[in-house]
Regions:
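Glycan-recognition and catalytic cores of secretory/periplasmic carbohydrate-active enzymes
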Residues: 1-332
């Protein structure tokens, strides 16, 4: 507020990833320069010089105001640093990513039950404050952290073919198959205690469709045909459930259903973007035309309702009446 920014690590690393990936694709040097600036910001301000890892949030003077080590945030750091390494060839970026990976494995991996604890204090000691945001449950493990850690480890393994990393990536995939994906409904369970006992009943359609393609991406890289076929079947089933329950007649994917089954008809930008990718992936895996049609309708919805034709960029969300909103109130 008052034009005094509070840099958030999650946003800074996403900016880094976006411009690095854009340069990788289009070779526009302006994109690489933007990525370089974001990389310098991550290294100079967000990386903890004493304990390693990245801070969650800084004030406008680059002083930590939340120095906790949220594993969700560490995952985005790995993801973006590896992408920058791939785009620029900067060996230091990969070294930073590997350092964060080793800290996560040392401090937040659960050797008894597998999976990862949500957060830690600045010095990586255990913490009781586990929430990613005010609307999240204060539980030991979450779908969202494991999803983005799987995404980050997939990208890291693409660049760094290490047996230990492969073992952890397989373990993450199995966490989804064994615990996080409900085998009956094909929806995700969002929160758990330390021993993987479910603690929530909401359905998050955006995360469902996002997981469907990220799970597939991870297993394709692992070159395990049996695991890949199993995940491909699960991936298509998840996309099928989302298509049957969550897509409005105009192609918008509703945000979620609460524990009572009541839908939130808002359409968030990231949910809609993930639906394009997820339904396209389901079509590639199954050949079923309804998935391709859903992907096209999802993009048409973006073009009609979410792209700001006057000021550029996208609206954060539109409501059930398709009125736009710029309020960002939840993490994806």
């Amino acid at each position: 507020e008052g034009r005094h920014p509070m840099p958030n690590h999650e946003y800074t690393t996403r900016i880094l990833w976006t411009f690095a990936a854009a340069f990788h694709q289009y070779k526009n040097p302006a994109y690489l320069e933007m990525a370089r600036k974001a990389y310098e910001e991550v290294c100079s301000a967000f990386i903890d010089p004493r304990y390693g890892g990245v801070f969650w949030m800084l004030d406008a003077e680059r002083r930590p105001i939340d120095d906790s080590k949220k594993i969700y945030g560490q995952a985005f750091a790995i993801y973006s640093l590896v992408e920058y390494h791939a785009a620029s060839g900067d060996a230091g970026a990969l070294e930073q990513a590997l350092a964060i990976y080793e800290l996560i494995e040392k401090h937040n991996y659960d050797p008894l039950h597998t999976g990862y604890l949500e957060s830690a204090n600045r010095d990586w000691s255990p913490t009781e404050e586990l929430r990613l945001s005010a609307i999240d449950m204060n539980e030991k493990k979450s779908m969202n952290t494991h999803l983005h850690l799987m995404e980050a480890y997939t990208r890291l393994y693409r660049e760094w073919r290490d047996d230990g990393l492969r073992e952890r990536l397989v373990s993450l995939v199995n966490n989804f198959l064994d615990h996080i994906i409900d085998s009956r409904s094909h929806h995700l369970i969002l929160f758990f205690d330390e021993s993987w006992q479910p603690k929530s009943g909401k359905v998050s359609y955006g995360h469902d469709i996002e997981t469907s393609w990220l799970l597939d991406e991870a297993t394709q890289l692992l070159t395990d045909p049996i695991l890949a076929r199993k995940c491909q079947k699960v991936s298509v089933a998840m996309a099928e459930a989302v298509l049957a329950e969550g897509v409005a007649p105009d192609g918008g994917l509703i945000y979620e259903r609460d524990e009572s089954g009541r839908p939130d008809h808002d359409v968030h930008w990231w949910v809609q973007a993930e639906s394009v990718v997820g339904f396209a992936n389901a079509y590639q895996n199954s050949g079923r035309p309804e998935f391709l049609a859903a992907a096209v309708r999802a993009w048409d919805f973006i073009a009609e309702h979410l792209i700001d034709r006057i000021h550029g960029e996208w609206f954060y969300k539109v409501d059930g009446e398709r009125q736009e909103s710029t309020v960002n109130d939840v993490p994806d």
